């Protein structure tokens, strides 16, 4: 199963995340199938590749809880329904 989840990167205590599509059995920092965006919890900055995310969701990818809340804030699910 393909999941949309966060991949950690950055220095200690200055962490940020990439939003990626990867198989559910792949380790957290393993090689992703596709990078779909960026999230920095310190500054609350988010950059998303919305068309690619919508494509992955239509193909059946399941977002994790944290990614789901980020996508809800960015109103990606409204574009999925349209």
From Swiss-Prot:
InterPro entries reported in the protein's UniProt record: Ribosomal_bS16, Ribosomal_bS16_CS, Ribosomal_bS16_dom_sf
Cellular component aspect of the GO annotation: cytoplasm; small ribosomal subunit
Keywords: Ribonucleoprotein, Ribosomal protein
Designated name of the protein: Small ribosomal subunit protein bS16
Encoding gene per record: rpsP
Pfam family, one: Ribosomal_S16
PANTHER family from the UniProt entry: 30S RIBOSOMAL PROTEIN S16 (PTHR12919), SMALL RIBOSOMAL SUBUNIT PROTEIN BS16M (PTHR12919:SF20)
One function term, GO molecular function aspect: structural constituent of ribosome
GO biological processes: translation
Record's keyword annotation contains Ribosomal protein: yes
SUPFAM superfamilies referenced in this protein's UniProt entry, alphabetically: Ribosomal protein S16 (SSF54565)
PROSITE patterns named in the record: RIBOSOMAL_S16 (PS00732)
UniProt key word Ribonucleoprotein: yes
Family that this chain belongs to: Belongs to the bacterial ribosomal protein bS16 family.
């Amino acid at each position: 199963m393909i999941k949309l989840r966060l991949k950690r990167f950055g220095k200690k205590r200055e962490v940020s995340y990439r939003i990626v599509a990867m198989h559910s059995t792949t380790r957290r920092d393993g090689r992703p199938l596709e990078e779909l965006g960026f999230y920095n919890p310190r500054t609350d900055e988010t950059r998303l590749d919305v068309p690619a995310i919508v494509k992955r969701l239509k193909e059946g990818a399941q977002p994790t809880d944290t990614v789901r809340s980020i996508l809800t804030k960015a109103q990606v699910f409204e574009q999925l329904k349209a």
